Curated annotation (Swiss-Prot):
Subunit organization: Homodimer; the beta-strands of each monomer intercalate to form a hydrophobic core, while the alpha-helices form wings that extend away from the core.
Biological processes per GO annotation: mRNA catabolic process; negative regulation of translational initiation; positive regulation of translational initiation; regulation of carbohydrate metabolic process
Pfam families to which the protein is assigned, alphabetical: CsrA (PF02599)
Protein known as: Translational regulator CsrA
Role, per record: A key translational regulator that binds mRNA to regulate translation initiation and/or mRNA stability. Mediates global changes in gene expression, shifting from rapid growth to stress survival by linking envelope stress, the stringent response and the catabolite repression systems. Usually binds in the 5'-UTR; binding at or near the Shine-Dalgarno sequence prevents ribosome-binding, repressing translation, binding elsewhere in the 5'-UTR can activate translation and/or stabilize the mRNA. Its function is antagonized by small RNA(s).
MF (Gene Ontology): mRNA 5'-UTR binding
Organism: Xanthomonas oryzae pv. oryzae (strain KACC10331 / KXO85)
GN (gene name): csrA
Region span, Disordered: 51-70
Length: 70
């Protein structure tokens, strides 16, 4: 596992087309923004596990939705 340190507003690149930006830190929560091509699925781990089990349908464009869990 690669471990990186980033400050609020800083970004890291995954390959040539995915960016992950630290948007904010509050207590033990970190808000991140992810920019990825539409053909790259981005899910929180618990949602990904549900999809793998077949418990949750894969929504079209789900990685572009708003995660309003603050």
């Amino acid at each position: 596992m690669l471990i990186l340190t980033r400050r609020v507003g800083e970004t890291l690149m995954i390959g040539d087309s995915v960016t992950v930006t630290v948007l904010g830190v509050k207590g033990n929560q970190v808000r991140i923004g992810i920019t990825a091509p539409k053909d790259v699925a981005v899910h929180r781990e618990e949602i990904y596990q549900r999809i793998q089990r077949g418990d949750e349908p894969v929504a079209s464009g789900a990685h572009h939705g708003d995660d309003s869990s603050n």
